Amino acid sequence: MSEPIRVLVTGAAGQIAYSLLYSIGNGSVFGKDQPIILVLLDITPMMGVLDGVLMELQDCALPLLKDVIATDKEDVAFKDLDVAILVGSMPRRDGMERKDLLKANVKIFKCQGAALEKYAKKSVKVIVVGNPANTNCLTACKSAPSIPKENFSCLTRLDHNRAKAQIALKLGVTSDDVKNVIIWGNHSSTQYPDVSHAKVKLHGKEVGVYDALKDDSWLKGEFITTVQQRGAAVIKARKLSSAMSAAKAICDHVRDIWFGTPEGEFVSMGIISDGNPYGVPDDLLYSFPVTIKNKTWKVVEGLTINDFSREKMDLTAKELAEEKETAFEFLSSA
C-alpha cells in the first residue's frame, strides 16, 4: 500500500459532496490501492449535518479510508493537501444578479486561495466546482501565487459528458462510443459545445459526428442550446441542481488528472489560457480540449476552427473577460 494522500472536499455537507464522497472513499477516483485521508470542510452552521455525513462514511467501513476529518477551520482543512476539490460556494438566490453572486464568491475563493498558499503542498491539484467556476478558479489561483497555475482547473466535464450523452442518444449508441467532444470557454450558458472534431463508433468503425448524424442544423442549433441549458432544465424538473451527474463528472475529471487520458482521446477542463494556440486571450480560466499525462495537462493542438466556432469561442471568452474584470474590481477594493 502506498502512503495516504490528503484530499479535501469543501461544501462537504452539500448535495454534490453527498454523491461524491463515497466514490472517492471506495477507490473509484485515485485507484484501489491508494489510501486516503478525507478532509471535509463546511461553514459552521452546517457542522451538525457534516457530523451525519462523517458517521455515514465511517459506517461505509471503506478499507481505503484511513481517516475522515470534519472541520469548519481553514488551517485544519488545507494543511498538507495533495488534492483540493472546491465544491462549496455561495448559491445564486432568487433575484440575485450574477454580479452579486460573483462578489460573494470572489471573497470565498480569495480566502481559500490564500489558505492553499499558506497550508497546502505546493504540488496540490486544485479542482474548482463551485459556481461561477471559471472565475472562482482564477481568483483562487491568483491568491496562491506560489502554487503553479497549471495545478488549478475547473469543472467543465459535466458539460462535456452532457454533450457526449446528447450525441449518443441521438444516434442510439452508448456514451462510451462517443469521444472527443469539446467544451470551449465558460461553464455558463455561453459555453460552446463543439462536436466538429468528435468521433462516434458505428458498426465497429469510427466516423465523425457530423458525418454520422447528417443533421447540421440540429448540431449547430438545438444540440448546443440543450447542452448550454441542461443545468437549468434539471433544476426546473427536480427543483434541485444537478448533484449525481456533477459528482460523476468530478470523479472523471480528477481520475483523468491522476491517471491520464486514454491514447487518442481528449477531455474538456477549464485551465489557464496563457499561450494557448486558439487565439483565446491570456490570463483567463477557459475550457479547452486537453490530454493529460504524468498529472500534467496539455492543450490539444492543430484543431481547425471554422467561422461558426470562432464566433462562439470569442463570445464565451468575452464573457469570461467581463467576469474577471468585475471579480478583480471587488478583489482590489476588498
UniProtKB/Swiss-Prot annotation:
Record EC number: 1.1.1.37, 1.1.1.96
Domain of life: Eukaryota
Cell compartments where the protein resides: Cytoplasm, Cytosol
GO terms, biological process: malate metabolic process; malate-aspartate shuttle; NADH metabolic process; NADP metabolic process; oxaloacetate metabolic process; tricarboxylic acid cycle
Keywords: Acetylation, Cytoplasm, Methylation, NAD, Oxidoreductase, Phosphoprotein, Tricarboxylic acid cycle, Ubl conjugation
Gene source species: Felis catus (Cat)
Keyword Acetylation: yes
Catalytic activity: (S)-malate + NAD(+) = oxaloacetate + NADH + H(+); (2R)-2-hydroxy-3-(4-hydroxyphenyl)propanoate + NAD(+) = 3-(4-hydroxyphenyl)pyruvate + NADH + H(+); (S)-2-hydroxyglutarate + NAD(+) = 2-oxoglutarate + NADH + H(+)
PROSITE patterns reported for this sequence: MDH
Quaternary data: Homodimer.
A molecular-function term among this protein's GO annotations: L-malate dehydrogenase (NAD+) activity
Family matches, as Pfam families: Ldh_1_C, Ldh_1_N
Function per UniProt: Catalyzes the reduction of aromatic alpha-keto acids in the presence of NADH. Plays essential roles in the malate-aspartate shuttle and the tricarboxylic acid cycle, important in mitochondrial NADH supply for oxidative phosphorylation. Catalyzes the reduction of 2-oxoglutarate to 2-hydroxyglutarate, leading to elevated reactive oxygen species (ROS).
Amino acids binding NAD(+): G11, A12, A13, G14, Q15, I16, A17, D42, N105, Q112, V129, G130, N131
Sites bearing N-acetylserine, chain numbering: S2
Name the record gives this protein: Malate dehydrogenase, cytoplasmic
CDD domains found in the cross-reference section: MDH_cytoplasmic_cytosolic (cd01336)
